[in-house]
Each structure stands twice: as structure tokens, then as C-alpha cells.
Amino acid sequence: MSAHAGFLLDSSVALGAFFEDEQNDYCVSVWRSLVDVPGFVPALWHLEMGNILSRALRAGRIGTDALDDCWARMAAIGLQVLPFHGDARHWTQRASDWGLSAYDACYLDTALQQRLPLATKDKQLADAARRVGIPIYLNSAESRR
């Protein structure tokens, strides 16, 4: 399946590494696997994580020390950023075809282009991935919710 050894990491799984109320066994297993298995993210991932973390900071869900810790932990795992392909029209069409947001369509399209399994907790994204033949990384009951 894979053009690269490894998997594509969705932000929904990464959140489980930073927020206890988002955590489950699937998130922990995926995060731990990054010690031995390369993790890839689409170019939008860091911006998406920045948006999530800045909203958490503004809402008082995390403090600045926790924010710094999140960024340090992300840097330490050495995620490899995959470049964008396509344009806004491409992402809009993919989103429409798959019934996803343009962001999630970016994840799925990147997984297809790179032939990578996808690590996600997002049921809608996981269902769309399965429909187009993309396996869910470390497939488990929790990754199917």
C-alpha cells in the first residue's frame, strides 16, 4: 500500500496526546508508535494544530507552559511534512465528492497520493478513507467510532 513506510497523522489523534479528555487507547498507541514508525502530515497540519491550541489557550483550557510543551512534543517526534498538491478548486471538489470538509479532504487526498494509511479518530473521515481503499492505521474499535 505505502509509497513511504509510515502513516499520515490526523490532528484528531494528536489532540489525544495533549488533552486528557480527548485521549483514548487508540491515540496513545498511535503516538507511541511514532518512536519506531515515521509519521507524516499534510502541510496544513501545523496550522490546524496552531488554531486548535490557540483556541484552547484563549478558552483557558491550557496555559502558556502547556502550549510550549505541546509544540516541543510535536517537534520531538519529527513529523515529516508533505507538500500540498492541487488548488482550492481541487480541495473543494474532493470535499464535495467525499462529503468531508476541505481540511479532511486534504488529509484523505494526501493519504491517497502518498499511499499511506491514515491515523484518525474522526469517524466521517475514517469511513471516507475506507470507501476509497485507504486503511486506518492501527485499526481498532476506537478508530471506528
What are these regions (language model features)?
Residues 1-6, 108-145:
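Acidic, PIN/NYN-like endoribonuclease modules and their adjacent C-terminal/linker elements
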Residues 1-44, 56-68, 132, 143:
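Short, well-structured N-terminal submotif of metal-dependent ribonuclease cores
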Residues 9, 41, 102, 119-120:
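Short beta-strand scaffold positions
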Residues 14, 45, 86-87, 107, ...:
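Alpha-helix capping/helix-boundary segments
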Residues 26, 48, 90, 127-128:
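Phosphate- and divalent-cation-binding pockets in alpha/beta enzyme and binding domains
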Residues 51-58, 113:
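Short glycine/serine- and small hydrophobic-enriched flexible loop segments
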